[in-house]
Amino acid sequence: LLLLAGCTVPSQHATVETCKADNQMQQTTLYFGLNRPAGAQISGSEWKGFVDQDVTPRFRDGLTVFDARGQWLGNDGKVAREPSKALMLIHGKDAQSEKNIEALRGIYKSRFAQESVMRVDQPVCVQF
């Protein structure tokens, strides 16, 4: 039994703690719904325009976009489903990145009449 004690898998948190300072970054994933409360779904060209005009200038070092399908339990007790886009950003944990991310959330909500843009943050260790 004592031999097995050394076989535990370290947690993700421990991995970040042992990451070299130069490799410590933040991963933020934003989830953008594509349905409007009224009217047509947000089109591919509208999404591309948002990425090209709003996201890329703020995160020039790179980004990743995934097609997604979201669902949640509405206040009415019914499951709502919606096509979505997930935008993954790897960035420094700094005030400018924070400002840029919040700007993107605000722009998208305003431009496309969205109630929210979900945000998930986690520390990561990045190597190229």
Task: Give the ranges of each region predicted by the language model.
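C-terminal motif of bacterial Sec signal peptides marking the signal peptidase cleavage site
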Residues: 3-6
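Bacterial signal peptide processing site
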Residues: 8-10
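Terminal, regulation- and interaction-focused segments at domain boundaries
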Residues: 23-44
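Mature extracytoplasmic domains of secretory-pathway proteins
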Residues: 46-84, 89-95
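Glycine-rich, aromatic-bearing surface loops/beta-hairpins
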Residues: 14-25
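Surface-exposed flexible segments
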Residues: 39-52, 97-109
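Helix-rich interaction surfaces within compact, conserved domain-sized segments
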Residues: 79-128
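Short, catalytically relevant binding-site loops at active-site mouths
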Residues: 35-37, 70, 126
